[in-house]
Amino acid sequence: EVVRSNNFDPSKLSGKWYSILLASDRKE
């Protein structure tokens, strides 16, 4: 979807995944 692609925020997505990876790493 073009509209959704326009609203895409790479930095926000990266930060979100970074937090998830950190939490996942901490669990292990």
Curated annotation (Swiss-Prot):
GO terms for biological process: sensory perception of smell. The keyword Transport applies. Keywords: Olfaction, Secreted, Sensory transduction, Transport. Belongs to the calycin superfamily. Lipocalin family. It is found in: Secreted, Extracellular space. It comes from the Eukaryota. Its main location: secreted. SUPFAM superfamilies: Lipocalins. PROSITE patterns: LIPOCALIN (PS00213). This is Odorant-binding protein 1. GO terms for cellular component: extracellular region. This soluble protein may play a specific role in odor discrimination and perception. Nasal mucosa.
